[in-house]
Amino acid sequence: MDNKALAKKQLEDTLSTLKQLDDNVWIMQYKSNYGLDKLLDKGCGNIMDAVKFLQKEVNFPALNINPDHSGFACSTFNAKTPEGGFILGRNFDYKAAPCLVLWTTPENGYRSLSVVDTTFFIHGTKYVPLKNAKRPLRVMGAPYMSMDGINEKGLAFGVLEIKSKATKQQTGKKPIITTVAIRAVLDKCATVDEAIDLLASYDMHDSIFINYHYQVVDANGTSAIIEYVDNKMHVIRQEKEDDCLALTNYFLTPGGDNHDGRGYDRYEKIMTTLKDKDGTVTEDEAMDLLSKVTLHYRHPALKHMVITLWSSVYNCTEKSMLMCAGMDYGKKYKFTLDKPCEYTVL
C-alpha cells in the first residue's frame, strides 16, 4: 500500500470510530500518524504554524483562525485515593460546546487518553455537528487540541488560563505552542521530572494571546505546577511527598501578575476540602468537589455562555478517567486507556 492509500485508509479508519454519546460527549480513536516528532523538530511558534503542518500531514482543511480566548478558566488538583492510588481532578471552563474524548497510539510515543475542546478548530465560532459533511476532516487535528489527558505511564496533565501577558520566550530554542506542548508531554513523558525537562527544552509561545499554566501528576504521586512569569519558567513542587496542590486562574509563583483575581474562591474551596479529608478522596468525592467549583455565566462582552464543559478525574494508577460533561453530574462516564471507545455509564 503506497503512502497516499495508507493515509486515506487511516483517515477512514479514524472517522469510522467517531461516535456521539450524548449532547455533550463524543468519542474517537485516532488511527493515523499525526507527525509529532516532525513538528517538534520543525518548531511551532504560533497557531498558523500548527494549521499549516496539519494541512500537509493529515489532510486538515484550510480555515481561518480567529480564536476567542475570553472566559477560559479551569481548576485542577491532585490527591490520593483510599486504595493508595493518585488522581488529577480537573474542570475545564469555556464557551459551551461538546467535548471529544480521544485515544491516540503514536508510532514513537506513549498511548494516551485525552479530552479535546471542540470549540477551537472543529466547530469554530459557530457550532456545527462533528459529523456534518463539511466538518469531519477537522477532527484529524484533534491530537493537537487536547486540553488534558493521561498516558500509559500514568502521567496526567492539564492546562489552565491566567489573565496575564502571553508567554513568548526567545532564548534560541525551538518554539512550541500550548496545545503542542500538551501533546508532547502526553506522548513523551513518564514522570513529572520528564515533563518539566521537556517543557524547559523549548521556547514556550502561548497559543492565543494570554498566559497559561499547568498541573502535572504521575503514577508515583508526584505533582508539580509549571508557570511562566515574564517569559521565565517556574516550577512549584510538593513540600512533602503526596502533598496536595491545586491550581485555578492566578499565579502561585511570587511576583506573578494577579490583578484579575479569578479563581481565589475556587482554590480555597479545593484546598480546604482536601485538607479536611487529609488529602485522600475517592473518585466520586473528587467529582463532587469539582461540581462545587464550576462556572456558569454569560460573558459580559461576547454574550456567550461560559460553563464547565467537563469535569474529569484521572486515575494515574488505573490509567482511567471518570467524566461528567455539560455540568450533568447525574451522569458519569468511565473511560480506560486500554479500551479505546469503550465506556461505562455510572
Stretches with model-predicted labels:
Residues 251-255, 262:
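Mature, function-bearing regions of proteins
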Residues 183-186, 196-199, 271:
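Non-transmembrane alpha-helical segments in soluble domains
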Residues 159-163, 181, 199, 216-220, ...:
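Short, structured patches in soluble enzyme cores that scaffold and shape functional sites
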Residues 1-189, 204, 281-346:
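N-terminal mature-domain region immediately after signal-peptide cleavage
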Residues 263-287:
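Long, charge-rich alpha-helical interaction segments
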Residues 191-194:
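Alpha-helix N-cap recognition
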Residues 197-207, 214:
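Secretory/export targeting leaders with adjacent low-complexity proregions
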Residues 209-251:
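Extended amphipathic alpha-helical segments with heptad-repeat/coiled-coil character used for oligomerization
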